[in-house]
């Protein structure tokens, strides 16, 4: 309780009365604080705290002497002062107890009658409220003195006690000082104030995390799906969100173990992941069955062998007779709407055998359709032999073409067979336009069975929405050529059932090991990114993917056997179907393949492509798309996959002429020295820039060699490698090999194995690698005419069956 607050001019600190009892007064500058005449004596701290409920150690007001304006009561709550500025214990009016803190009694009595007035200040606290049954307003006034962190929710203003002036009467001081009441505090006690504020500080953070978790749950498949190369084949609707947790979805098992090398140490058993990964890798490598005639029998008995036949067609060759085989159950299966769409630059698991990799042309006749493949074997092969994937949305970055968040969940494991998922029925058994082959796209015939008419009908008239051709560019009708292959009147227009147009990935190498190391971007569950007007050009993406198969025998370059196959895929945005619906007569899509002199066999899609066999330029081949068939096919796919974003369409398959070892991007030579107690292995490799149209690095290079003879210990392994004791295989991994590598991409791998059941028998070395940004054939593509534009042209190649023997 504070009373008798005096209103007087304070004297200078240094002036003191000589008769003052220095033993009974507190030091003004005690506790190391700045000297202040407003500090109460040390021995009065407990009493002041008990009476006023404030801190015993008062803070200086900081105002000069003679300042009578508003006082910051948070810093200064002074009892009465004497002439020299020393604190005096406040007394009740008329009190005779003499509690004057030993200050000058003469000075007090002189000024008390005419200078001193009484102010009754009662800072209300919890005990006072409970004892005196204080009103709500008094409770607010007392709580207002408590310094709390500002509430993030409640915005009630808090009036500072400093607004109380020293010349106010006790009536005015007792009146509540808040200008705005706080209804939230009316039912709370001061003791519960902290609890009442708990929801203001805690739950908002929790709710924010809850909202964030909810958002992550919804968006994470889109976030992690953009970089997640799961087993690419299909995407079932029930597995659209396979990873609902806050952690990123796990990558599929990589093809090589990641354990540290075990060189110079006793033989130990590798971990389960290493064993499974290495086993999967060695099983899938020798899986191109149609190359058995070149590379010999398949090395692994567990590999999937598919007998396929192919008919490579020269442009100069006459079209074979129409063959109308019976549709097998494989062909009759309609593509289920369970696959997500990946752009053209994203690869897909090709059917067994490299795309378009087949023997020389054979006589026309009925074809043998392979029976369905074993489920377990195909799942393993397709899941682990897909080629590296890339993104397509990066190219559709304009606001017209692409929206944010166009990402999708990683696809689930593949179906029983690739064909049963991606196949769709042909135009009709009587049309004579459909057959199948294991090495070509399962959704279309292996060979063009419908000849291009030599007397073509004129192209359709230019639609009013199509912009005029720029000067110097030939129109579609400038050259006499058919717009589409002739269609028998007894059959409906072909649907062009190109399977991988709606599969999760459409560019593949059947023997690549890099699917687990490269993210996939581009699939989406959202709407089509294509938003365009009638005068805009349609974005189209193209991708060349080539597979090199090679067999090296010892160090003799003349014994190297090489085969290179490739495919070209076009990718269309899903919104193109709406554009075609609004423009039923779109511009014909015409393109030419340039630098095609090295292409020995070119197999265009007979359902969608027309070619001019009379072209004289051997370095250029021109094609144009059967637009009615393309529109029909894309419409069908859009109905089956309304959430798809991209439609990938196989357009060309081809074979590249090879010049032996000079056509291999990585030359190999293996040397074995087998003894009863040990085996020495040396692998020499050389990066060959001459094999590529543009020198690019070989990525994720892996060397895998099985070693028999009961290996008990590894010695002198350079560089470090991973040994799988259960499968008796050693694996080297090199991130990349290029001209910038050590020694210009030339190096050796060395290893010595201690044997218990020697000698070892030399086994073939299996090599895998991928490369982006170049092709081995040097082919390129360019558009002819207007109405379309290339948003992306992707080029890549990878090792297929890449072997080296002693």
Swiss-Prot record:
**Polar residues bias locations:** 265-276
Compositional bias annotation for Basic and acidic residues: 16-32, 40-54, 315-324, 377-392
**Residue limits of the MHD domain?**
537-805
Subcellular localization, as worded in the UniProt entry: Membrane, Clathrin-coated pit
Renumbered residue ranges of the record's region Interaction with DPF motifs-containing proteins: 539-545, 571-573, 645-648, 791-796
Under InterPro entries, the record lists: AP2_Mu_C_sf, MHD, Muniscin_C, SGIP1_MHD
What is the protein's membrane topology class? Peripheral membrane protein
Where are the annotated segments for Disordered?
A: 1-115, 142-278, 315-533
Name where it mostly resides.
membrane
Q: Where is the composition biased (Pro residues)?
A: 245-260, 346-369, 454-473
Output the Gene Ontology terms for molecular function: microtubule binding; phospholipid binding; SH3 domain binding; tubulin binding
Report the residues modified as Phosphoserine: 78, 104-105, 107, 149, 151, 156, 169, 236, 265, 287, 289, 300, 316, 319, 371, 398, 484
Question: Which parts of the chain span the membrane according to its record?
Answer: none
Residue stretches of biased makeup (Low complexity): 335-345, 436-453, 480-490, 497-520
Q: Any one Gene Ontology biological process term?
A: positive regulation of receptor-mediated endocytosis
Q: What does this protein do?
A: May function in clathrin-mediated endocytosis. Has both a membrane binding/tubulating activity and the ability to recruit proteins essential to the formation of functional clathrin-coated pits. Has a preference for membranes enriched in phosphatidylserine and phosphoinositides and is required for the endocytosis of the transferrin receptor. May also bind tubulin. May play a role in the regulation of energy homeostasis.
Name by which UniProt lists this protein: SH3-containing GRB2-like protein 3-interacting protein 1
The source organism is Mus musculus
Lineage from the top down?
Eukaryota, Metazoa, Chordata, Craniata, Vertebrata
> Corresponding gene?
Sgip1
